[in-house]
UniProtKB/Swiss-Prot annotation:
Subcellular location: Secreted
Principal cellular location given in the protein's record: secreted
Pfam families with a match to the protein in the record: Pectate_lyase_4
PbH1 repeat ranges per the UniProt record: 151-173, 263-289
Protein name: Pectate trisaccharide-lyase
Functional note: Cleaves unsaturated trigalacturonate from pectin. Activity is highest towards polygalacturonic acid, activity on methylated pectins decreases with an increasing degree of methylation.
SUPFAM superfamilies documented for this protein: Pectin lyase-like
Active site: R224
Catalytic activity, as annotated: eliminative cleavage of unsaturated trigalacturonate as the major product from the reducing end of polygalacturonic acid/pectate
Cofactor dependence: Ca(2+)
Organism: Thermotoga maritima (strain ATCC 43589 / DSM 3109 / JCM 10099 / NBRC 100826 / MSB8)
Key word Lyase present: yes
Subunit description: Homotetramer.
């Protein structure tokens, strides 16, 4: 069954004429995340604060960046302009770091590995150039723009990820308390995986993998937006715009948006899903907004009433409640949040998501 609605034409026209950004957003190193990254624990009673209170350092080369991401202690690391990794590679990020971008900050041909760490913030950075021509499916190098392993309290905010090799943001090895917010994912295949493998310990994995995705812009991506094994995920106020393209792995059409597997509990609300359009829909080719999958199926529910999702030129979303009439999880048991009206999501997210949107005024006097 295809879900089609009359406001599609007006929405497309709106997006065409809102290509110019509405302006920068004032930001601070004291900003706090919304979502699971905000949840306090015994070792982090204020939730995720990154390197707040540590030395502020400005970096302009890959070597300078790695020097401080691998240093012990708190640091606020400011990426000033474009950093090119030659050869392409990943670098490790230790605990208690804030990495923020200024002056159209870019990381080209490089990725960040947050492994065995806690309390890391990454904001306002554009990632590109990590696609390996000799490894289009990411099987040889397995490079991710951001790879989170066995880590907790991570906030990834206002970043842009363009056509990478494997994952854009992958969350694995029992990582926990993570928020991905206001990011833009463009022309990427396997966008964001939560959970390393179907073979992970189900009890341990079920206690980990608490992840929030909100106000992200998925543009012409193919799958895993996100795909969750075990754990919990709250997916709200994201914009999915699925145009035709030739994907990294040879796919022409995006496949699915949010997927739940291995008993994961996923609640999807206030999102706007835009499929390929009328011609493809009438030909029987359509985008699947939510999917239940895996050798052990996951659970997934949709918001209702003021929290409903919108679906345009999409297949019927797949759902599987834990208990009929109840959401797969109640995020407000963990944190407070405010939903934007779903009809406003396309403009809000297109205008606000991605790198280059934040201005950190306190950094102007720190140089």
């Amino acid at each position: 069954m295809l879900m089609r609605f009359s406001r599609v034409v007006s929405l497309v026209l709106l997006l065409v004429f809102t290509a110019v950004l509405t302006g920068a957003v004032k930001a601070s190193l004291n900003d706090k995340p919304v979502g699971f990254a905000s949840v306090p624990t015994a070792d982090l009673p204020e939730g995720t604060v990154g390197g707040l209170g540590g030395e502020i350092v400005f970096v302009r080369t890959a070597e300078e960046l790695e020097k401080y991401t691998t240093a012990e202690g708190k640091y606020v690391i400011v990426v000033d302009g474009t950093i090119v990794f030659e050869p392409k590679r990943e670098i490790k990020v230790l605990s208690d770091k804030t990495i923020v971008g200024i002056n159209d900050a870019k990381i080209v041909g490089g990725g960040l590995v947050i492994k065995d760490a806690q309390n890391v913030i990454i904001r306002n950075i554009h990632f590109e150039g990590f696609y390996m021509e000799d490894d289009p499916r990411g099987k040889k190098y397995d490079f991710d723009y951001i790879n989170v392993e066995n880590s907790h309290h991570i906030w990834i905010d206002h970043c842009t990820f363009v056509n990478g090799n494997d994952g854009a943001v992958d969350i694995k090895k029992y990582s926990n308390y993570i928020t991905v917010s206001w990011c833009k994912f463009v022309d990427h295949d396997k966008v964001s995986l939560v959970g390393s493998s179907d073979k992970e310990d189900p009890e341990q994995a079920g206690q980990a993998y608490k992840v929030t995705y909100h106000h992200n812009y998925f543009k012409n991506c193919i799958q895993r937006m996100p795909r969750i094994r075990f754990g919990m995920a709250h997916v709200f106020n994201n914009f999915y715009s699925m145009g035709l393209r030739t994907g990294v792995s040879g796919n022409v059409f995006p496949i699915y948006g949010v997927a739940s597997a291995m008993g994961a509990k996923v609640h999807v609300e206030g999102n706007y899903f835009m499929g390929y359009g009328a011609v493809m829909a009438e030909a029987g080719i359509a985008f699947l907004p939510t999917r239940i999958m895996g050798p052990v199926e996951g659970y997934l529910t949709l918001g209702e009433g003021d929290a409903k999702n919108e679906f345009y030129y999409c297949k019927e979303p797949e759902v599987r409640p834990v208990e009929e009439g109840k959401p797969a999880l109640d995020p407000r048991e963990y944190y407070d949040y405010t939903l934007d009206p779903v009809q406003d999501v396309p403009k809000i997210v297109v205008d606000g998501a991605g790198a280059g949107k934040l201005v950190f005024e306190e950094l102007n006097t720190a140089q």
